[in-house]
């Protein structure tokens, strides 16, 4: 099984507002940059979108390590919030509807195909590739305005 690393980030100007996302895929030292923009979105949607688009770009099942600065996503996966949400018919422990259900469901489909591990990185820190993703995601907002 091919081993791929994906660095991701999402950004939003105002929340909600225009947003950008970036995913950097690395396989055998070769980097591929994916990026996108949405007119009216949220930061969390852009974080999810970056991961989904990164996984969507893989042409066969892979062993993937996703690096993200989103505690929201890392906790939802690694602490199995997402499993609890599904059991509770996509409701939080406070009985409120989970936000971004459409994207969580899409992500779950890719998690069935790929062996994915999520790692939290500190945002706006010394992680070069996370910082690059952040810059690209923010640049998408500026370019599209």
From Swiss-Prot:
GO terms classed as biological process: DNA replication, removal of RNA primer
Protein name: Ribonuclease H
Keywords: Cytoplasm, Endonuclease, Hydrolase, Magnesium, Metal-binding, Nuclease
Residue sites binding Mg(2+) 1 per the record: 9, 47, 69
Cofactor(s), by name: Mg(2+)
Keyword DNA-binding on entry: no
Entry's Gene Ontology molecular function annotations: magnesium ion binding; nucleic acid binding; RNA-DNA hybrid ribonuclease activity
Stretches that traverse the bilayer: none
Primary localization: cytoplasm
Oligomeric form and interacting partners: Monomer.
SUPFAM superfamilies per record: Ribonuclease H-like
Cofactor binding: number and manner: Binds 1 Mg(2+) ion per subunit. May bind a second metal ion at a regulatory site, or after substrate binding.
Cellular compartment(s): Cytoplasm
Chain's role: Endonuclease that specifically degrades the RNA of RNA-DNA hybrids.
Record-annotated RNase H type-1 domain positions: 1-142
CDD domains, sorted: RNase_HI_prokaryote_like
Sites where the protein binds Mg(2+) 2: 9, 134
């Amino acid at each position: 099984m091919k081993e791929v690393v994906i660095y991701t980030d999402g950004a939003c100007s105002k929340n909600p507002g225009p947003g950008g996302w970036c995913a950097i895929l690395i396989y055998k030292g070769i980097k591929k940059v994916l990026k996108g923009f949405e007119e009216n979105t949220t930061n969390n949607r852009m974080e999810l979108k970056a991961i989904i688009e990164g996984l969507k770009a893989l042409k066969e099942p892979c062993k993937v390590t996703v690096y993200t600065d989103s505690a929201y996503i890392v906790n939802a996966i690694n602490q199995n919030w997402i499993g609890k949400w599904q059991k509770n018919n996509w409701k939080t422990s406070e009985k409120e509807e989970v936000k971004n259900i459409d994207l969580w469901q899409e992500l779950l489909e890719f998690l069935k195909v790929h062996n994915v591990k999520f790692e939290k990185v500190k945002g706006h820190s010394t992680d070069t590739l996370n910082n690059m993703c952040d810059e690209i995601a923010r640049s998408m907002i500026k370019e599209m305005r």
